[in-house]
UniProtKB/Swiss-Prot annotation:
GO terms for cellular component: cytoplasm. InterPro entries: GTP-CH-I_C/QueF, NADPH_dep_7-cyano-7-deazaG_red, QueF, QueF_N, QueF_type2. NADPH binds at residues 90-91, 258-259. Pfam families: QueF (PF14489), QueF_N (PF14819). It is an enzyme of class 1 (oxidoreductase). It catalyses: 7-aminomethyl-7-carbaguanine + 2 NADP(+) = 7-cyano-7-deazaguanine + 2 NADPH + 3 H(+). The lineage of its organism: Bacteria, Pseudomonadati, Pseudomonadota, Gammaproteobacteria, Enterobacterales. Homodimer. This is NADPH-dependent 7-cyano-7-deazaguanine reductase.
Length: 282
């Protein structure tokens, strides 16, 4: 369990509790979680973070009424900046989106502006929102992570408790390489409910070559680890930066959806540009 799992900042969350579903607009349903909870223990300060990035959300269950009462549906794309004070707690996000269901809006842009305003207020940071009509996305191909998949290794694993031990001496030689590694075996668990979170991860770096077996063992050790998606990605980034000391590093995870939402955080210290096309499990 993470050291801050019982922090008072988490006590008021609806996550893990029985809740009523409202279908009329209510911005107060949104709840934020301070990013400092997992940054402070590592000595990471908001004015001197070793990375940049965003939390990319896809909203698959978004519906409201137009001015005449006719239901509208859209797919939403949200990007929440890494500098925001809070991340958005996903169950509260789902409950908030449900509150749009029987609410009338004059037009699509009013919905977009409402989402952007409320999410920015909750996160205390920069948020951008785009809404897509279904016919804009129909026929869109399933994407994939570019890079070398490290999953097909003939190794024995019998320990699934999180540890950074595998990253000790995980680099070798003096030759500098530039490569992109991919794994679909990332599984962590919700910080509060301990429900499983399934994801694929892409690690792009320039530096001394990272031992792929040790890296895979490290990623598999998240299997019993309890943290939010965004926190796991930052943990992986910082662990790799600390132990492997690459010149450039980017870590990008795309998680499967839950409650009509998927979360796709990325962190980088280079000019990394993430692909936003959904993967096969999304």
């Amino acid at each position: 369990m993470s050291s801050y799992a019982n922090h008072q900042a988490l006590a008021g969350l609806t996550l893990g509790k029985s809740t009523d579903y409202r279908d009329t607009y209510d911005a107060s349903l949104l709840q934020g979680v301070p990013r400092s909870l997992n940054r402070d223990p590592r000595g990471l300060k908001a004015d001197n973070l070793p990375f940049h990035g965003t939390d990319i959300w896809t909203l698959y269950e978004l519906s409201w009424l137009n001015a005449k009462g006719l239901p509208q549906v859209a797919v939403g794309h949200v990007e929440l900046d890494y500098t925001s004070v809070n991340l958005i707690e996903s169950k509260s996000f789902k409950l908030y989106l449900n509150s749009f269901n029987q609410t009338r809006f004059n037009n699509w842009d009013e919905v977009r502006q409402t989402l952007e305003r409320d999410l920015s207020t909750c996160a205390q940071g920069k948020v951008s929102v785009a809404l897509y009509r279904l016919d804009e996305l129909e026929g869109q191909p399933i994407g994939h992570f570019n890079g070398t998949c490290i999953d097909d290794q003939d190794i024995t694993i019998d320990n699934y408790e999180f540890t950074t031990d595998y990253l000790e001496n995980a680099t070798s030689g003096e030759k500098v390489v530039e490569e992109t590694l991919v794994s679909h075996l990332l599984k962590s668990n919700c910080l509060i409910t301990h429900q499983p979170d399934w994801g694929s991860i892409q690690i792009q770096y320039r530096g001394r070559q990272i031992d792929r077996e040790k890296l895979l063992r490290y990623l598999v050790s998240f299997r019993h680890h309890n943290e939010f998606h965004e926190q796991c990605v930052e943990r992986i980034f910082n662990d790799l930066l600390r132990f492997c000391q690459p010149e450039k590093l980017s870590v990008y995870a795309r998680y499967t959806r839950r409650g009509g939402l998927d979360i796709n955080p990325w962190r980088s210290n280079s000019d990394f540009v993430p692909s936003t096309t959904r993967l096969v499990r999304q």
